[in-house]
Every structure is written in C-alpha cells, then in structure tokens.
Amino acid sequence: VGTNDPRPAMSLDPHHVHNFWGVSPALDLRDVVRRCRADQATAEEEARPDASDAPFSTLLVGTNDPRHIVTTLARARRHVGPALGERSMTFHVYESSMVEAARHVLLLCVLMSDDLPPSERVERFLEIFMNATLRESTAELVETCAARLERVVGAMFAGEADAPDIANDRVCRVFDFSLLKFKEKDELMECFRSWRAEPRGSRGSSSSAHRFDADALRDKRLRKYYDDRYDHRANVVDWDYNMRVDAAGAGVIHFKHFAQFRLTGVAYPVREATFPKTNPSLLGLAFGKTKEFKDRDLADRGRSVESRGFWGDVLNSPYHCFGTDAEDKKLFRVANRQRVHNAVEVSEHNVAACLFEMRAGKPWRRAGGGVETETMNAWSADVDDEVASGLTASAKANAEWCGSDGAVFEETWRAARVAIVGPTDLEKAFLAKPKFARAFDAAVVGAWHAQRITPALGKVLKAETRGGETAEVDGDETRERNRKGVLIVEGSKYFVFADAKASAAFVEKTETLARDAGCAPVPPAEDEPEDDEDVPESGIRADGSRRPRRARGPGVVKGVDDVHRCYMKTS
C-alpha cells in the first residue's frame, strides 16, 4: 500500500493458499501472438511469413482458470478458416496445486457437455466459476460431472482408454494426463471423489464437500483477515471498491455485486435464487505447523498438519476474467453518468459468445440494441449444417433444444488438446525436458507465479531461425521459419491490495525477469484512441474536442488489454 494511503497498511491474506480465478481479462492467445509478431515485424521493417494454419502450442503457468483456453478455442476459426485440424491447438496447464488443475478440468467439462441448453450451460459455468455456494440443481450438476470424470479419467489411468464408451467421451479425447506422476494421479482422482455426494447410509469420506459449510468457512477467513475491523468490513469493502477497483478502470463492476462477493462469496447472482450448497471445487488442502513450543531462538515449533477447507481468494473478485473487457464496446456504454451494463451481464455475454462461436463457427454479432435474428436462431437450435440446411428461418426460431451440439461443436473440441502438468518443480520436471525446447508459440504466466519467469521458461519458447537453419514442422520447412515465441505476463493492476505505484513496480520487476529469460518487450506502437462509440473515426467530437488517446508503453499491444505485458523471444 502506498505511503499516501489514508488507512493503515493491511498485509496480504496469509490464509490465501489457492487461486481459483485470475485478475485479468480472457485472451485469444492466437490473436495476441499474431499481433505481437506483426508489431515486431513493423519495428524491424521485415515481413514475417504467416503460419496461422500451423499447429498452435501454449504453456499456461498459473493462469488459475481456463478463460484463455475457452476464448482461444472459440475464436480459432477466425485465424485458420472454417476447418479445424484435429488436435491443432495444444494447451499445457501448470498450477501450483492439483485442486486448481482439477477445477480446470471441471469447468471445461461443463462447457463441453451437450446435455444442457446453451443459455443454461452459461449460467451453470459462471455459477461454478464465481460462487462459493451453489443452487441445489447446480450442485447436482457438479456431482454428475465429478462422477463422469472419475469414471473416464480412472479408465484412462487404468489403460482402458480404448474402450468404446471411454474413447467416444470428449473428456478422453481432449485431456492428456500422461505428464502426471502416480501420486499426482491419485490426488486428481481424490479431488473428483470429494466433489461427489456421500451415498445414503454411508459414513462417507472426511474430504467430502458435504461435511463443510462454505458460509462458516468464509466467515472464519474474514474474521481472521479483518481482525478488529470485522464489524466494519462493509466500510473496508467500500474503500477497496472506490480506491482500487473503480480507480483502476474497472467501474463496470457494480458496487453491489463487488460487496456481495466480498461479504457472502456469491459473485454471480441468478435471478432470485438461493445458494444453500457448498461449491466443492473451491475446497482444498492447506499445509502448516502447529505452534506448540518455541526453540532457543524463540521460533515457533510444532507438528506438521494439513487442513481441508476454503483457502481461496476473499479479496479479489472473479469479475476480471470475463466481465471487464469484451469485443462489443457497447456493453460499456455510459448514459446519464451511469453504466448501462455491469460486469455480471458482460460475463454472461462473453461466455455465451464463446459457446455460440464454438457451436456455430462464426462470431456473435449484435444488430442495433439486440442480437441478430440469425444468431438467435443458431443459439436456440442445433447448428449442425446438414440439419440446419433443410430448415427455414422460422423453423429454426421455433426449434427446441434437442440435446446435441452438432458437428461444428464436435470439430471445435477435436481441435483441442489440454495437457495437465503436475504441481511439482516446473523447471526440473517439465521445462528441462528436451522435447519441450522451443516448442511453444506462447507462454502465459499469472501474476501469482511471476517468480517462475526464468531462463528455463524462455528456452521453451520458439526462437527465430538464422542463416541456413530451418525449423521443420510436419515436413514443412518454410511455414515455421522466423516465428518467435511470445511471453505474456499478467499484471497486478486489479489487485485490491496494490496501488498504482506497487503495480508499476511489479511491471518493472517482471520486465527484468523477462529480459533475463531472453525476451524483450514488444516495441510500443502509436497510441490508439480510447474506445468511444459517440465519436466518429475522425476523432473529433460534436463539441469540437478531440477524443483522448490511450497511453501505451513497452509490452502493451494494440488491441490487447493493458493488464497483460507481452515479450518476444530474442534468441
């Protein structure tokens, strides 16, 4: 906290062990890499060959949720055309604990399941993603997905992946668990089991989510963090919102929603519903030591213990992932000095747009104040081309959900491969392996894992070939030539405990780490005008004033949010 802060400094939450969501907008990683390479080519006055149809590989280090995977996968056809190659996009996911990795699997499983209508699937996804407590129907969905994951993933671990009922499951086709050790596989299966309900008449497992009260667990966390400010926590929340959230440019987050999350853990309200069930995907293990005695140096000593409970973030809201940025800038329109939409509505729009593009193969477009009729038809009906070709527009509009997402959706998921990396020593167990040297087009590092930006991480990014060297990919020696990898680092702009000075220092430190890893910031281009729908392309308003221009520094790429910093591989 800065020295000009009017309140006493509050330290980081010492009981914040697991990170279940990021603090930055979702990225289309393929688009970011393309923009970075284009900026680099412009700066060097050198044309770069386009390899948009080449396989795309990404390493995600501590991104905490699958927002980048969902967005990149949904918009893939914008870069490669209508046909997606099988397993043409590979995502390697590293998290610091297995419960965080298991949550990636759960959230993607909810999106890829075709037994729910799209609109309901969006609600369930956001509810599981954002809320500490769930509706009863959503809790049943989590148990159903957990049973499915336990059955399919267990069969994969047992070498039965070729069985017809397992091989045809999207979970088996999309996820790769071959990089996990036996102990990590056991931990993953234990996560799935802990999400399931206890059988009637059974004593159950001590790790079952039904033995925990999320409200009581959060209340203990809040009492410990706020201490003597607990009775005035609503005032602290108000200060954090006005001096951190709104001041950082995230005013689209409504204060009512932010306060509801901070006080109750419910960030995504669903109409007038109640949330009586604990969200089991937010429960995890924390390890520590008891304070039983002090040694001669007056240091606390005791037994090593583990405790299962709610150890997630209670300060930073999950709205930044899908709710603070969108392609449709009309969602951020201001009328009468009030925002027309809020972060909850923007989150619904972004997830719905991604799911629609997965199903229809084209972007979600809005006409006037609402959604195009053709878009709504494809959203409410099955979009299989062979079926849709025989239906009129009115028949499509009146069609009911048939429980199948069609060929386009199936092809979208066949193009993806998500490999889970175990929460071990990343550098020794993964980055040091020869097969991953210069293997990734992009590496995304979360703000909580900035210390993992090391020279070893830089070595797994694709490097430019020089002289007579060639890089052969699938037998093509020209397609991959001169393709540099991109390092994308999440900033601390939206951390409620970091002021502008601390965020700037964080950017400077990550830039130093990136340079040591063999990467340089993408050269800054000309400043771009701020988005303002009431201003014409000339940049001059009706009153004669000019549209303000957004400052851009090194690493901030045009068309990409200013929370992330992008660095290009230099050698």
Which residue ranges define each predicted feature?
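Domain-level detector for long C-terminal conserved domains
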Residues: 2-59, 63-571
